[in-house]
């Protein structure tokens, strides 16, 4: 990772490179996967209330399966992701997010995807006693290929072709010095599927 002007108030620039490889042997055959990510991150503090962050990303992702050809892919993902953050007080902020991605598979049926993401997130904190997080995202997918394939699931991150909506709410409260409780609710909706709701309660003990 390479930094310019790190931890300065006006602006900073960081470049990172990550590479991962794995191989697994199963009774039905072996699989190999790899990923390479190059990321450029620019942060500019406009004033005490606003922060601008722009992330440029190139990701190469591949998978090879010995006996399941429909799981083989070599995906290249180019994305640009600007975020504007508004700070209200010391612990509260709102993020306005946009992300544009161009993704293509260079083997097999050579699927392509153009994805746009508009999002907003809200973070509220009260001196370590309680916290609230809410997120809402709108995705527009323009996918060219078989929408029922493994590759479409990977490229669209489990979303559907066309318009998608996702949301998340999380409330955290500190019950004592050793005990926290979290309430989490997740939802998603697309034009071709019914609304999916998922909720959970987590109790965390700190020793």
List where the protein language model places each region.
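Exposed, low-structure sequence patches enriched in small/polar residues
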Residues: 1-207
């Amino acid at each position: 990772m390479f930094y310019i002007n790190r931890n300065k108030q006006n602006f900073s620039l960081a470049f990172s490179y990550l590479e991962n490889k794995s191989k697994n042997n199963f009774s039905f055959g072996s699989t190999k996967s790899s990923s390479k990510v190059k990321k450029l991150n620019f942060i500019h503090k406009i004033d005490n209330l606003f922060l601008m962050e722009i992330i440029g990303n190139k990701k190469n992702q591949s998978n090879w399966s010995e006996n399941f050809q429909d799981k083989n892919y070599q995906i290249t993902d180019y994305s640009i992701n600007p975020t504007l953050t508004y700070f209200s007080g010391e612990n509260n902020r709102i993020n306005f997010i946009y992300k544009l991605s161009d993704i293509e598979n260079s083997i097999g049926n050579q699927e392509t995807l153009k994805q746009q993401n508009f999002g907003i997130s809200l973070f509220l904190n009260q001196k370590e006693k309680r916290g609230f997080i809410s997120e809402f995202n709108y995705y527009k997918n323009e996918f060219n290929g078989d929408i029922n394939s493994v590759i479409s699931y990977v490229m669209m991150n489990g979303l559907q072709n066309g318009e998608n909506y996702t949301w998340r709410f999380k409330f955290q409260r500190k019950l004592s010095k050793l005990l926290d409780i979290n309430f989490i609710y997740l939802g998603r909706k697309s034009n071709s599927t019914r609304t999916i709701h998922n909720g959970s309660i987590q109790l965390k003990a700190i020793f």
